[in-house]
Amino acid sequence: MSIISPQDVKKLREETNAGFGDCKKALSVAGGDFELAKKKLREMGIASAEKRLDRDAKEGRVFSYSNNIHAGLLLVSCETDFVALNHNFVNFGNSLIKELVESGRNSLATSQELELKNLAATIKENIQVKKIFITEIQSNEFVKIYLHGEQSKIGVLVKLKVDDFSKTEDKMLQDFAMDLALHVAALAPIYLRNDDVCPNYIKEQEEIFAKQLELSGKSESIVKGIVAGKIKKHLAEISLLEQGFVKNDKLTVREMLEEVSKAISSKIEIVEFKYLRIG
């Protein structure tokens, strides 16, 4: 039987980031063969990672990347905020979103799934890729991305279209695009415009509001008017274009788009947005 020295264990730990006990066990099973020990660690790690999948992973962070052809956001969860700051965790997320954006994929390849399992094995937490959002950037479009805070617990991507693409260099437009991303981070709209809201959802809300007014004693016509007003207010809360702009709530986002379009002499359109949040 080969003798496993503390120096051997230390070397394997430095190369794999695995725990002391796991490294010692892997070296023993591998008879001191470092490459075989690494393979054993991966096998052991994947097995233990599978066991951790039922543990809550309510922490994590959002990662982003853009290469002017595609852009994307990635939400990776973990169990503790300490791990969300771990350099291995952060490096994995940054590398993964870059690979996904550059390939235009919105799902993990087999090799990427294996990397995820190996990371979970090394860090010893339940780590999961929860959400992937990749969008293609068409001609006359550009994106603005905002990650909130040191731990990037909120990530926002806003894609805009400009009739005159040369205007994307305009500071007013760039500032407005960032303000839009900040707005989405702060108010978390669900839809871009009212027309995107499912008609069945609106009908359900109308029924709820009407039910609340059943005992009010008001006439049917007045109740209909009140319900219509409540629906309008509710849609303004969940539709980005109808929300009061975060930096000037006297104007809606739609009205701010028109103002900035006039100022730079080029029509601006919000094509889509994405909001991801940990927790």
UniProtKB/Swiss-Prot annotation:
Annotated SUPFAM superfamilies: Elongation factor Ts (EF-Ts), dimerisation domain, UBA-like
Classification via PROSITE patterns: EF_TS_1 (PS01126), EF_TS_2 (PS01127)
Coiled coil: none
Protein location: Cytoplasm
Key words, A-Z: Cytoplasm, Elongation factor, Protein biosynthesis
GO MF annotation, one: translation elongation factor activity
Major location category of this protein: cytoplasm
Region annotated Involved in Mg(2+) ion dislocation from EF-Tu, chain positions: 80-83
InterPro entries registered for this protein in UniProt: EF-Ts_dimer_sf, Transl_elong_EFTs/EF1B, Transl_elong_EFTs/EF1B_dimer, Transl_elong_Ts_CS, UBA-like_sf
Gene Ontology cellular-component annotations: cytoplasm
Its biological purpose: Associates with the EF-Tu.GDP complex and induces the exchange of GDP to GTP. It remains bound to the aminoacyl-tRNA.EF-Tu.GTP complex up to the GTP hydrolysis stage on the ribosome.
Family that this chain belongs to: Belongs to the EF-Ts family.
HAMAP family, A to Z: EF_Ts (MF_00050)
Protein's recorded name: Elongation factor Ts
